[in-house]
A protein has these predicted regions:
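Short, Gly/Pro- and small/polar-rich lid/capping loops
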Residues: 1-57, 67
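Conserved beta-strand/loop scaffold segments within soluble protein domains that form the structured core
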Residues: 34-37, 44-200
Length: 200
């Protein structure tokens, strides 16, 4: 079992709600394990019985700790940007031996101005032995602004012995530029499955 904190919920505006419906294909809800980053700030947060999300003290971002008791559980960590600027976030996932979890991430940009909006998400996964992890990342941009809508994801995956990691990424539409970097290190008998869709 992991240490839990009291959940923080907020009322979201319509733009944020609409973007979340696109980037979170499982359906974002302010319940269970979740963390919504909006314009560079974590605005709502919750832990589950077996998943704890802790704000980093040295870098912008969070540590997500997933207990071995987590079985067929989900954690949702979307990012929405509706204001111009650069947002860089470092998220680290620590998955204990034997855990079974789906991690739903991704970023949506709503741009109405002439300035650039850019999100760089650096995600690192530390997966123990005999675990099953599915990571779903959707990218999307919308709005009538002329400013660039840029998403640059970096994914580092370290998979322990006999574990399975499934990586599903989709660039839905509206993104002007993207640079994706992926690094993978597999332990003995570990497996990696990758599905990448570019729809823009």
């Amino acid at each position: 079992m992991v240490s839990r904190k009291e959940a923080i919920t907020v009322k979201l505006n319509q733009v944020t709600e609409d973007v979340l419906k696109v980037i979170d294909s499982y359906g974002f809800k302010q319940e269970g394990a979740y963390n919504l980053r909006l314009n560079g700030m974590a605005v709502c947060h919750g832990d589950s019985r077996h998943i704890a999300i802790v704000k980093k003290t040295d870098l912008p971002g969070i540590d997500i700790r997933i207990s071995s008791e987590a079985q067929n559980e989900q954690v949702h960590i979307p990012v929405v940007m509706s204001e111009p600027g650069l947002d860089v976030v470092y998220n680290d996932f620590y998955v204990e031996d034997g855990a079974d979890v789906t991690i739903v991430a991704g970023c949506g940009i709503h741009g109405e101005g002439c300035s650039e909006t850019r999100h760089d998400g650096i995600h690192t996964f530390h997966v123990g032995k005999n675990a099953n992890v599915k990571y779903v990342e959707n990218h999307y941009a919308e709005g009538n602004g002329t400013g660039g809508k840029i998403l640059n994801p970096v994914t580092k995956i370290y998979v322990g012995e006999n574990s399975v990691f499934t990586l599903e990424t989709t660039q839905i539409k509206g993104v002007d530029s993207t640079k994706r970097e992926t690094f993978v290190e597999l332990g003995p008998n570990a497996k990696l499955y990758v599905t990448e869709k570019l729809m823009t």
